[in-house]
Swiss-Prot record:
Propeptide: 27-31, 669-907
Signal peptide: 1-26
Keyword Secreted found: yes
Biological role stated in the UniProt entry: May act as a carrier of hyaluronan in serum or as a binding protein between hyaluronan and other matrix protein, including those on cell surfaces in tissues to regulate the localization, synthesis and degradation of hyaluronan which are essential to cells undergoing biological processes.
Predominant localisation class: secreted
Protein source organism: Mus musculus
Tissue expression as described in the entry: Liver specific.
The protein's assembly and partners: I-alpha-I plasma protease inhibitors are assembled from one or two heavy chains (HC) and one light chain, bikunin. Inter-alpha-inhibitor (I-alpha-I) is composed of ITIH1/HC1, ITIH2/HC2 and bikunin. Interacts with TNFAIP6 (via Link and CUB domains).
The name this protein goes by in its record: Inter-alpha-trypsin inhibitor heavy chain H1
GO annotation, biological process: extracellular matrix organization; hyaluronan metabolic process
Highest rank taxon of the organism: Eukaryota
Keyword terms of this UniProt record: Glycoprotein, Phosphoprotein, Protease inhibitor, Proteoglycan, Secreted, Serine protease inhibitor, Signal
Modified residues (Aspartate 1-(chondroitin 4-sulfate)-ester): 668
């Protein structure tokens, strides 16, 4: 970060799941905002200001969808370098990234990593990386892109990523690390939570705010299934002192919540996908058999062994009298404290603590011998002592290095451990520091029903060790199996778990075979403290109908993507343990699902068309490996220059399952309205005659207007509906004395005063009084109007020899920021927030489509689920957009009737 040339505006946000709160660095003290007089302050740094920075997190049934949007403005008289700098959790998958600058849109394409690597082989040969995402800490990955923003220009960044929230220690955590490094004109964190089980608690805190300022700026509420947190500080509330131009936003913003546990388990079904949440309450803690296997080789010298001893002493204090335990130490030789399990009596615990305080380091690393000794102790207890066979057995191993003594072949060690445990109990591996093969520890743990965790060499390593132990300290059930009717379920995620711990949650997802919902149920079998556990879960169909009415397409989309996320994660875990043909088959499955669901995973990359660095390379977004080098250890960074958007030779339409975020009109003419609050789209057609001019956008406050004239086919068959398209668009801004006329043949600036004319064969950037027009040869043009809006016009070419069809235009809204709330028009009226509810889903007159009842604008309409094409990103092929189709020229959805939007002139 340091030593970078040029200006860097850092937009740093870190949403991640945390086990423990982490101390924020360089925090400014929050100050009361009472009687202190605030002065107007310049929010820019070297002429560059962050106009807006917004984090939107929408959680539906544990599935979290994040969108980070930031707009920077360069008011300087020369170009500046700007950095968009965001940290995201390692468990998340990026699903979209886009930049809009100077009226140009730069869109990400997800493709297989092999194809992406071939395009960037030059960087690989040079030993450099064009990658934007790198490992940067314990639970995070850092996404950074540097771009050059022209003088008097702006750039908007939008990053989207998704993950499934994991319950730890009785709650779900969302932590957002805030570090903009300068004052932000419009700063906002908006967290919206919908949990069908009902929310039992919700809290939000900011480490960088005083209690008084937090009370003023953090709004939090929850009722029933819904929870909401909003943090929107003013510029004065961001200032570190009344006259300062520096920001106190430097630290963590943390949201925690949990859900009601009134049922033993909850089944959620939507669109033939299901999610099963299992976290029963009021269960008795099981006694446990616990063996710690500790590395005491010479490399543990110093702080590592001191912190390990501190953690072990605290863990021993917390053990219950019903537990049994032993300690195994391995260096060059292997030694155990007792050689067998002993009860956790006060006398035994004190003796064990004395043993921990006294042991010293010795020799190399006989990891294989240490593990086999620990396994032997647990196996012997289960086989020869009936009273010790019922508790939950747990093996925990801590090491900081690689095997150097005894058996050192990793594949043989894996085989030895697997054959010794034989699925009887879980093995948890803790890797201390970076000087070890962490993937080896991961494979070993996952092969034996556990997981691996890295312990970072830091002042809080003791707390990290204790934090891990707290997650497994209280087993409630063992040998948990969630069972479903065999013929009713497809593509099931992991449904057998060796142990279930207090404060956690088991989540299973899958697909339901067609027409099998009536027979769908879940049976749970497990072993509890001295008794068997049995439960049956049924789908509450009435409750599901109610949930679908409340959440509609968002619920359907999130349940399916939750299944996809879990499936990909599990396939990747299996892939890590396999080789040869089996590994290739798993890779193929992961790749297909990653492309289908638009996820950046270890097998895919996201490239950004139109951005190039000094070597002509486009940036690429990859998923870094867990063992990849930290950010400060990698090579030189690369700065990308925004160039005209060009078709990607490997671009492919985004899968039709994805809800694409577009508002626009194209083809016959089909209007698509994206509704962010629902993560869904509405659509309607307008049927009018060729020659009719329709008003698309009109802002009465500024006079900004967009009109479009319809054209028909060259020829039509008698008695058939005549298709119409937009063949002419007129954009005008009276405040800028600006007019633009666009046809499939020409682009004319200020036609009424004989202005300049361009063709679609040109590549040009035009600028007039705050309006920028970018012509991208034979593809599209983008109009950016000051801070008001950004629009795209797409060119559609038909076959030159066609006797029926002719060329036409599509019109899309990329940004309606700052347009007035009074904006009207067939598209403009939807720039303001819109809400709707959909219910009573049923087969329509077309058996392949679903009809439903929609309530919108206090009107009740019949709508049909369908698909429309969005050509904004791929003018040739387009991408299918699921939407609710409103019949009869949008009647009931649009204000008035469609003929109210007929105007007499293109301007």
């Amino acid at each position: 970060m340091e030593g970078a040339t040029g200006l860097r505006v850092l937009l740093c946000l870190l949403p991640l799941l945390t086990l423990q709160a982490r101390p924020a660095l360089g925090l400014a003290t929050g100050r009361p905002r009472g009687s202190e007089k605030r002065h107007a302050v310049d929010t820019s740094v070297n002429g560059v200001s962050i106009k807006s920075l917004k984090v939107n997190c929408k959680v539906t049934s544990r599935f979290a969808h994040y969108v980070i949007t930031s707009q920077v403005v360069n008011n300087a008289d020369k170009a500046r370098e700007v950095a968009f700098d965001v940290e995201i959790p390692k468990t998340a998958f990026i699903s979209d990234f886009a930049i809009t600058s100077d009226g140009k849109a730069f869109i990400g394409d997800i493709k297989d990593k092999v194809t992406a690597w071939k395009q960037y082989r030059k960087a690989a040969v040079l030993g450099e990386s064009a990658g934007l995402v790198r490992a940067s800490g314990r639970n995070m990955e850092q996404f950074t892109i540097h771009i050059t923003v022209g003088a008097q220009s702006k750039a908007t960044f939008r990053l989207t990523y998704e993950e499934v929230l994991k319950r730890r220690l009785m709650q779900y955590d969302i932590t957002i690390k805030v570090r903009p490094k300068q004052l932000v004109q419009h700063f906002e964190i908006d967290v919206d939570i919908f949990e069908p089980q009902g929310i039992s608690k919700l809290d939000a805190q900011a480490s960088f705010l005083s209690e008084e300022l937090a009370a003023q700026t953090i709004k939090k509420s929850f009722s029933g299934k819904k929870g909401h947190v909003l943090f929107r500080p003013t510029v004065s509330q961001q200032q570190s002192c009344p006259t300062c131009s520096t920001s106190l936003l430097n630290g963590e913003f943390k949201v925690t919540y949990d859900v009601n546990r009134d049922k033993l388990c909850d089944l959620l079904v939507a669109n033939n996908y299901f999610t099963h949440f299992f976290a029963p309450k009021n269960l008795t803690n099981m006694s446990k058999n616990l063996v710690f296997v500790i590395d005491i080789s010479g490399s543990m010298e110093g702080q590592k062994v001191r912190q390990t001893k501190e953690a072990l002493l605290k863990i021993l204090e917390d053990m219950r009298p019903v537990d049994n335990f032993d300690l195994v130490l391995f260096g060059s030789k292997v030694q155990s404290w007792k050689g067998s399990l002993v009860p956790a009596s006060n006398a035994n615990l004190q003796a064990a603590q004395d043993f921990v305080r006294r042991f010293s380091l010795a020799g190399a690393t006989n990891l294989n011998g240490g593990l086999l000794r620990g396994i032997e102790i647990l196996n012997k207890a289960q086989g020869s002592h009936p009273e010790l066979s019922s508790p939950a057995s747990i093996l925990i191993m801590l090491t900081d290095g690689e095997p150097t003594e005894g058996e050192t072949d990793r594949s043989q060690i894996l085989k030895n451990v697997r054959n010794a445990i034989r699925g009887r109990f879980p093995l948890y591996n803790l890797g201390f520091g970076h000087d070890l093969d962490f993937s080896f520890l991961e494979v070993m743990s996952t092969e034996n029903n556990g997981w691996a965790q890295r312990i970072y060499e830091d002042h809080d390593a003791t707390q990290q060790l204790q934090g891990f132990y707290n997650q497994v300290a209280n087993p409630l059930l063992t040998d948990v199996e969630l069972q479903y009717p065999q013929d009713a379920v497809l593509a099931l995620t992991q449904h057998r778990h060796k142990q279930y711990y207090d404060g956690s949650e088991i989540v299973v997802a899958g697909r339901i075979a067609n027409h099998k919902l009536n027979t769908f149920k879940a049976d749970v079998r497990a072993r509890g403290e001295k008794q068997e556990f049995r439960a049956t879960c049924l789908v509450d169909e009435e409750e599901m109908k109610k949930l679908l009415r409340e959440r509609g397409h968002v619920l359907e989309n999130h349940v399916e993507r939750l299944w996809a996320y879990l499936t990909i994660q599990e396939l990747l875990a299996k892939r890590m343990k396999t080789e040869g043909e089996e590994r290739a088959n798993l890779s193929s499955q992961v790749l297909k699902m990653s492309l289908d669901y638009h996820f950046v995973t270890p097998l895919t990359s996201l490239t950004i068309r139109g951005l190039t660095d000094e070597d002509g390379l486009e940036p690429t977004i990859d998923k870094p490996l867990e063992d990849s080098q930290p950010l400060e250890m990698v090579g030189p960074r690369r700065t990308f220059v925004l160039s005209a958007i060009q078709p990607s030779p490997t671009a492919h339409p985004i899968d039709s399952k994805l809800p694409l975020r577009v508002t626009g009109v194209d083809t016959d003419p089909h209007f698509i309205i994206y509704v962010p609050s629902k993560e869904d789209s509405l659509c309607f057609n307008i049927n009018e005659e060729p020659g009719v001019i329709l008003n698309l956008v009109q802002d009465p406050d500024t006079g900004f207007t967009v009109n479009g004239q319809l054209i028909g086919n060259k020829a039509s068959s008698p008695g058939q509906h005549e298709s119409t398209y937009f063949g002419r668009l007129g954009i005008s801004s009276p405040t800028s004395d600006f007019q633009l006329e666009v046809t499939p043949q020409n682009i004319t600036l200020n036609p009424s005063s004989s202005g300049s004319m361009f063709s679609w064969r040109d590549q040009a950037v035009l600028q007039k009084d705050g309006v920028v027009v970018t012509i991208n040869k034979k593809r599209n043009l983008v109009v950016s109007v000051d801070d008001g809006a950004t629009f795209e016009i797409v060119l559609h070419r038909t076959w030159k020899g066609s006797a029926v069809h002719q060329d036409f235009l599509g019109f899309y809204v990329l940004d309606s920021f700052r347009m007035s709330a009074r904006t009207k028009g067939l598209l403009g009226q939807f720039f303001s927030p819109l809400d709707f509810e959909v219910f009573d889903l049923h087969p329509g007159s077309d058996p392949t489509k679903t009809d439903a009842t929609m309530v919108v604008k206090n009107r009740q309409l019949t709508v049909t689920r369908g698909l429309q094409k969005d050509y904004s990103k791929d003018p040739r092929h387009g991408a299918e957009v699921p939407c609710w189709f409103v019949h009869d020229n949008g009647a009931g959805l649009i204000d008035g009737v469609h003929t109210d939007y007929v105007v007499s002139d293109i301007f």
